[in-house]
């Protein structure tokens, strides 16, 4: 009889059937079933889970590595862009400085050239004025001389007689002889 009870208990806990099955009723399951299921899950799931975790870890590390490489490339490109920007700014300053100095030089050259042209024009104007003044003076002198000679001749014609005329000629001849003896 003791065996019958044990067999009945065994039969109640373990259902003997043709197919394998798990009892999903938590109240009817026992610790052995739970241990088997957990150990099977750990045994078979360990490889799958470790593969999944390893693949995920590799994917994350690859993503991080790629992100770090892109960050380094972006940093290098940023540094190169900063260097090019500084070079461009320096070149722009040099161009601006040389442009300003060239502009000042050309301005000075233009002012100097204009001043030179003004001086030459002023000198030309003054020379023209002097020559015109001299010509006017000479014309006036000629007219005055001509007028004086005409009046003198007129006066002499009216006042001179032959005797006065002869005395004047003798006097001038005497002056010429005196000058001749002084020069010898």
From Swiss-Prot:
Q: Where are the transmembrane segments?
A: 31-53
**Which cysteine pairs are joined by S-S bonds?**
none
What would be one Pfam family of this protein? Answer: ATP-synt_B
Recorded superkingdom: Eukaryota
Q: Does the keyword Transmembrane apply?
A: yes
| Molecular-function GO term, any one | proton-transporting ATP synthase activity, rotational mechanism
Subcellular location per the Swiss-Prot or TrEMBL entry: Plastid, Chloroplast thylakoid membrane
* Keyword field: ATP synthesis, CF(0), Chloroplast, Hydrogen ion transport, Ion transport, Membrane, Plastid, Thylakoid, Transmembrane, Transmembrane helix, Transport
Question: What would be one Gene Ontology cellular-component term for the protein?
Answer: proton-transporting ATP synthase complex
Q: Look up and give the membrane topology term.
A: Single-pass membrane protein
List the InterPro entries.
Answer: ATP_synth_b/b'su_bac/chlpt
Miscellaneous: In plastids the F-type ATPase is also known as CF(1)CF(0).
Subunit-structure text? F-type ATPases have 2 components, F(1) - the catalytic core - and F(0) - the membrane proton channel. F(1) has five subunits: alpha(3), beta(3), gamma(1), delta(1), epsilon(1). F(0) has four main subunits: a(1), b(1), b'(1) and c(10-14). The alpha and beta chains form an alternating ring which encloses part of the gamma chain. F(1) is attached to F(0) by a central stalk formed by the gamma and epsilon chains, while a peripheral stalk is formed by the delta, b and b' chains.
The record's family statement is: Belongs to the ATPase B chain family.
Job description of the protein: F(1)F(0) ATP synthase produces ATP from ADP in the presence of a proton or sodium gradient. F-type ATPases consist of two structural domains, F(1) containing the extramembraneous catalytic core and F(0) containing the membrane proton channel, linked together by a central stalk and a peripheral stalk. During catalysis, ATP synthesis in the catalytic domain of F(1) is coupled via a rotary mechanism of the central stalk subunits to proton translocation.
Name this polypeptide is given:
ATP synthase subunit b, chloroplastic
Organism of origin: Aneura mirabilis (Parasitic liverwort)
């Amino acid at each position: 009889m003791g065996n019958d009870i044990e067999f009945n208990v065994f039969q109640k806990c373990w259902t003997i059937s043709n197919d394998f099955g798990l009892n999903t009723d938590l109240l009817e399951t026992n610790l052995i079933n739970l241990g088997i299921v957990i150990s099977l899950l750990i045994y078979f799931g360990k490889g799958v889970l470790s593969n999944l975790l390893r693949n995920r870890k590799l994917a994350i590390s690859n993503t991080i590595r790629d992100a770090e490489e892109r960050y380094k490339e972006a940093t290098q490109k940023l540094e190169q862009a900063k260097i090019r920007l500084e070079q461009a700014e320096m070149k722009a300053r040099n161009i601006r400085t040389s442009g300003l100095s060239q502009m000042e030089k050309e301005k000075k050259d233009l002012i100097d050239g204009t001043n030179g042209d003004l001086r030459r024009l002023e000198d030309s104007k003054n020379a023209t004025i002097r020559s015109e003044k001299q010509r006017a003076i000479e014309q006036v002198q000629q007219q005055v001389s001509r007028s004086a000679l005409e009046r003198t001749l007129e006066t002499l014609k009216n006042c001179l007689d032959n005797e006065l005329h002869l005395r004047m000629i003798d006097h001038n001849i005497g002056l010429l002889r005196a000058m001749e003896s002084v020069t010898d």
